[in-house]
């Protein structure tokens, strides 16, 4: 008799995706982040659902409803901090996942890569809207500053901003719609993640060597299921350590002050995972130019497959490109640091240099170095 998991219409999909899936035998721990992102998403949806049961999306009660969750709801504090710090873990995994894709040339799978970019944008939008919900000072002013950037769009900008706000400032209408979108977006992200996997399974996984692994495949289960479980346990250990020992480490103290439109905080800054993009935005004196640079800092990923000039797929055997990749990593860390600093000398200049370097590495230096490496292969 044929096994039910191979014949049942639903079980067959699960079987072909997670059990009998042929996987390369040499994929490293850098390939763990996809499953970790799935775990993060499930965790965020679950904790978010329980938070939504007690949260009220009204400017008068939003802040106190979050306080109520932390003080009065059974284990509300741990659910709230798991959700807040879960977002940080989500973005750590996202950055590692994208970095792995850049390093090993996974962007050659164009459909998978492009869906991944859409996923990144959707996750960033969700996180931004979620940050507004507690209705603290940084929530309010962050929402005001970031939505206001759209006013830089010529002709329709001002109307667009007021349409998003639902009025002439960030107010009750804005909070209500942000809550609605923040609730629905994770489910859209889950659907997109399935599309992401669908496209990936059309081609099969890449591997560290960058050469085809068709001649040496192993079943996903038990080899990679057990490997993923180890990754998940490590992720949960880090998350729970953060939640239980220093839940406010990555947050902003200003967000413990209720939103006040009459009092601007001295330094308006987003959560740490947006600081690199925020630094790029601030390093350009022109408003429209800054907004374009902000969008392009992520959208540039869509150009990466078209800028691939190397004869080899990954960077495993390309030491010069490796140096550039780690320079890019250091540059992004520098931008993250600058994004959290006040706008004054020398931070302005450092931010501008780091921003120029970011675009130069991806658009000019990497393709050039790849051509040089191709020529070195001839020697």
From Swiss-Prot:
Keywords: Electron transport, Heme, Iron, Membrane, Metal-binding, Mitochondrion, Mitochondrion inner membrane, Respiratory chain, Transmembrane, Transmembrane helix, Transport, Ubiquinone. PROSITE patterns: CYTB_CTER, CYTB_NTER. GO terms for biological process: mitochondrial electron transport, ubiquinol to cytochrome c. Gene3D superfamilies: Cytochrome Bc1 Complex, Chain C. GO terms for cellular component: mitochondrial inner membrane; respiratory chain complex III. The cytochrome bc1 complex contains 11 subunits: 3 respiratory subunits (MT-CYB, CYC1 and UQCRFS1), 2 core proteins (UQCRC1 and UQCRC2) and 6 low-molecular weight proteins (UQCRH/QCR6, UQCRB/QCR7, UQCRQ/QCR8, UQCR10/QCR9, UQCR11/QCR10 and a cleavage product of UQCRFS1). This cytochrome bc1 complex then forms a dimer. This is Cytochrome b. It comes from Vulpes lagopus (Arctic fox).
